[in-house]
């Protein structure tokens, strides 16, 4: 049997910190004691080691295990990635065996895309919800651009600042849904 690289939160516990990292072990433990933790999974520290050994590539075995667990998560949560009526949105958080506050990356709202955003807004066409959805999408693209695509945070912040200046506002919260949609499109263009 091959090595296990992915654990649902229900499969881990607090003693597995070396394998699951601090966040993964704690999420598993919170699940075990019955706290209301949305179901998810942890990719092990051994998978990270293998990723580096494979030249910074996720090998087929690990990818298959990740996809199998995504399917389990979809089933458990009753949602599906890319579904226009009931999309699954997840947070991706990096972790380590030891606590490193402020050093680990996060991507929120993985699962949002242009089609999902339009469908969500069509299902609840209020100005407040439209702004909320576009702000979430803008934040997702911003985090993804920084963490995955390695587009510098400073550059992204310059785009946001330019939009605020163009609109004559001081705070991100003063940007409209249309402004946030335009920012999301600018981020994707980069």
What are these regions (language model features)?
Residues 1-190:
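Nucleotide/phosphate-binding sheet-loop regions of phosphoryl- and nucleotidyl-transfer enzymes
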């Amino acid at each position: 049997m091959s090595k296990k690289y992915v654990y649902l939160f229900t499969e881990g516990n607090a003693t597995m910190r070396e394998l699951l990292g601090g966040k993964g072990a704690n999420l598993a433990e919170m699940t075990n004691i019955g706290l209301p933790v949305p179901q998810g999974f942890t990719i092990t520290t051994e998978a990270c080691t293998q990723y580096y050994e494979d030249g910074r590539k996720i090998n087929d075995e690990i990818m298959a295990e990740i996809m199998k667990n995504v399917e389990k998560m979809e089933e458990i949560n009753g949602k599906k990635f890319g579904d226009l009526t009931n999309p699954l949105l997840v947070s991706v958080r990096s972790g380590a065996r030891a606590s490193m506050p402020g050093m680990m990356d996060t991507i929120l709202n993985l699962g949002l895309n242009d089609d999902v955003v339009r469908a969500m807004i069509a299902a609840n066409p209020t100005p407040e919800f439209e702004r909320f959805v576009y702000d979430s999408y803008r934040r997702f693209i911003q985090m993804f651009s920084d963490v995955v695509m390695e587009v510098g945070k400073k550059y992204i912040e310059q785009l946001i600042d330019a939009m605020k200046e163009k609109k004559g506002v001081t705070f991100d919260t003063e940007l409209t849904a249309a402004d946030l949609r335009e920012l999301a499109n600018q981020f994707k263009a980069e």
